[in-house]
Amino acid sequence: MTENEQIFWNRVLELAQSQLKQATYEFFVHDARLIKVDNHVATIFLDQMKELFWEKNLKDVILTAGFEVYNAQIAVDYVYEEDLIIEQQHQGQQGYTEQAFQQLPAVQSDLNPKYSFDNFIQGDENRWAVAASIAVANTPGTTYNPLFIWGGPGLGKTHLLNAIGNSVLLENPNARIKYITAENFINEFVVHIRLDTMDELKEKFRNLDLLLIDDIQSLAKKTLSGTQEEFFNTFNALHNNNKQIVLTSDRTPDHLNDLEDRLVTRFKWGLTVNITPPDFETRVAILTNKIQEYNFIFPQDTIEYLAGQFDSNVRDLEGALKDISLVANFKQIDTITVDIAAEAIRARKQDGPKMTVIPIEEIQAQVGKFYGVTVKEIKATKRTQDIVLARQVAMFLAREMTDNSLPKIGKEFGGRDHSTVLHAYNKIKNMIGQDESLRIEIETIKNKIK
């Protein structure tokens, strides 16, 4: 990269970072690379699914940087992984092609090609799991073996498993890789037992370079001791030959109660990492990414509203977008307002429809009356102990009892940021679990509001 190219690219990144939220920047911009600037055309390498975001949101950034560095209007040519690899192959370098993929008849990897590290949204709740997964993909069998990823459903464990496999396969098309759920491993074991072909099963799994097992907790069943024995031997064969093993579970190794102790011990030989539900910023980034797949306009307040409604896992967010798409297509509308989104997701919300008819002002008034403070004080910045508690309780109830997004709630509390509302909500939620008197106070206020 020439000096001007480096200056230009640094300026693009600087401007992008100043305009985007951190989680959005990390996902859409961080991994992009400038290949060259030639004849006033910047060639930028990025994941293909991110091109639309760049076209919509970063065109002005590139124009600004272009005029600053080259005193010219810079056009953009986006190239994707496939383009670069084809170019490398023409230069005699090793690369991944569909033909190379098909030259591995001995092992069907069963990887899902749509999952990669590039399209995995990172946040504080999964950063260590992502870092460990990338480390394993870069040096399989040497860094963390096994890698054990645990967390609730819909948080990205399967995505990371496939991303590891796809990354390894990209670097080494001849790698023997197998992705399989523990349930399917059990099914294969039963079939081979019935057919008296256990040697085939052993050859299939014990000669792998990378074994990716999803939902290993399914193996923890006392009635399947024979399956545990086979997996134990498979694990040993791979580990002894420095072949990488990655496991996912909905619980820690120590909580796999029906699994043999010798397996649990081996699962803890390497690294155990946890994935927790995404925070608000990460959910916004996930939605910003996912809506690129839909031909609708999602205003920012709608995105933030949706991010505030589902805080347990990514699947709920994906399901909500499908519900919205169905309603929007039926009504033949292009722009998804908060009202349309609320109507579409009402049946999906785990706790049922919230009481959208309750004004936030009513909540503030009842909370203020209970704690002896005014609504004006609740909305202001004064931080005496009684006012702070009343303010946080009011925010908590606004989140619990209405469909309003976190930013909308913050606006009703003197223009506060959504992160302040989220902090108040989490704080009161935790306090309720520890302070019975506070729980009773809040229930009393809720009954008055209803």
Swiss-Prot record:
The gene is dnaA. Residues 329-450 are annotated as: Domain IV, binds dsDNA. The keyword Nuclease does not apply. One of its GO terms (cellular component) is cytoplasm. It is found in: Cytoplasm. SMART domains: AAA (SM00382), Bac_DnaA_C (SM00760). NCBIfam families: DnaA (TIGR00362). This is Chromosomal replication initiator protein DnaA. Its main location: cytoplasm. Residues 84-109 are annotated as: Domain II.
